[in-house]
């Protein structure tokens, strides 16, 4: 019985620290130092939330740049079902999926080069990836330009404007947030 009191005291102390103080402290500091990130990195237009800078969206129209395929369950880019397809490189089903994606992209982009960028046919580990490389966006320019009646120069400048460089040049590669790029496309039409 003598050992019960210190054990119970330690349990209550740790419960208060890990279940109350620590979460409250991290929430307050997160809201104070990183309010945009702590609230989901939401992209707003006026009072309307158009998406998150962290999660891709399923853009299917010819007038939009398309991101990486999503491997999430039920619907594409479902944040509640995040996860990869878990198909190994040696799995024939993965080969079939990639071949189907390549064929669909070539059919939708007849004026683009025949070399489809790899990130447009392979899903990310989370299934929610919102970034593609500037090269993958540039590959889609002929289709988007034709659908929106824009010049190749306009779209090339837009891609350059929305390209994000890595923090350290030799670690990583430039990327484009597909949600922000497509929202910028919609603003060009206004």
Curated annotation (Swiss-Prot):
Keyword Amino-acid biosynthesis: no
Transmembrane segments: 10-30
Record's GO cellular component terms: plasma membrane
Keywords: ATP-binding, Cell inner membrane, Cell membrane, Ion transport, Membrane, Nucleotide-binding, Potassium, Potassium transport, Transmembrane, Transmembrane helix, Transport
Disulfide bonds: none
Chief site of localization: membrane
Molecular function (Gene Ontology), one example: ATP binding
Compartment annotation: Cell inner membrane
A Pfam family: KdpC
Coiled-coil region: none
Presence of keyword Disulfide bond: no
Family of this protein: Belongs to the KdpC family.
Subunit structure: The system is composed of three essential subunits: KdpA, KdpB and KdpC.
PANTHER family associated with the record: POTASSIUM-TRANSPORTING ATPASE C CHAIN, POTASSIUM-TRANSPORTING ATPASE KDPC SUBUNIT
UniProt protein name: Potassium-transporting ATPase KdpC subunit
């Amino acid at each position: 019985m003598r050992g019960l009191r210190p054990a119970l005291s330690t349990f209550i102390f740790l419960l208060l620290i890990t279940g109350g103080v620590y979460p409250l402290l991290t929430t307050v500091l997160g809201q104070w130092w990183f309010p945009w990130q702590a609230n989901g990195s939401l992209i707003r237009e006026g009072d309307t939330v158009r998406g998150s800078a962290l999660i891709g969206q399923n853009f299917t129209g010819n007038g939009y740049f398309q991101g990486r395929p999503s491997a999430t369950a039920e619907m594409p880019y479902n944040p509640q079902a995040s996860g990869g397809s878990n198909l190994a490189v040696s799995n024939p089903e993965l080969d079939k999926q990639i071949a189907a994606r390549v064929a669909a992209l070539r059919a939708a982009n007849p004026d683009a080069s025949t070399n489809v960028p790899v990130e447009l046919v392979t899903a990310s580990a989370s299934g929610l990836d919102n970034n593609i490389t500037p090269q993958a966006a540039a590959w889609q320019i002929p289709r988007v330009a034709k659908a929106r009646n824009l010049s190749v120069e306009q779209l090339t400048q837009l891609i350059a404007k929305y390209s994000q460089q890595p923090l350290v040049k030799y670690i990583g590669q430039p990327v484009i947030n597909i949600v922000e790029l497509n929202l910028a496309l919609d603003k060009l039409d206004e």
